[in-house]
Amino acid sequence: MSNSIVEIEDTKCVFIFGYNASTSHPIVARRINHAKAKGAKVIVCDPRKIETARIADIYAPLANGSNVAFLNAMMNVILEEGLQDQKFIDEHTENFDAFYETVKAYTPESTQHITGIEPEMLREIARTYAKAETATILWGMGVCQFRQGVETVRALASLAMLTGNLGKPNVGVNPVRGQNNVQGACDMGALFNTLPGYQSFADPEINAKFAKAWGVPSIPSKPGVPLS
């Protein structure tokens, strides 16, 4: 995750893609509810009408297998309507021209037979996400454990970069683990090869920081031994 779970509730737009937070991660679902209560727009894209879809401002029941076409069409709208963060693109991305040539072909109209989503709804989703002061993307196993998994994750990351929703508070690309116990264990550093926050054992400054916080002289500089 590029941003912390706590930051979700202070974003202006929550874009949920292939992820049922209320079932898999109730704590994350609670943060989404808090964000909604504070006025954030909530967008849910999922073939199933999941629990969070009940509070969503927009629910898009996109067809199975249409993830990449849907996201490319979103980015097509953002570019055609000039909603991209060009400064962020110029300073922090590469190969933008080739990317633009790719998504030009994915209009809301040309992808409707793939996604099953009306063009005007797709445009509304793109505008809502792109115009938000801050926006966070959440996705889960519904995206990753799928034959388009890699391509979909790349498209979601491209969407965040296209709108400058990286590298600042309350934004980001935030893939979650399969279940809440796994998420908590990993975030808290209960892994053999990372410290809390996925920080590296190999960095002396990080090691010193945790040694001081835990009140010990030092901690090992090498990862532990995995079970497998």
What annotation goes with each model-predicted range?
Residues 1-181, 188, 203-228:
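Cofactor-pocket helix-loop regions in the catalytic cores of large enzyme subunits
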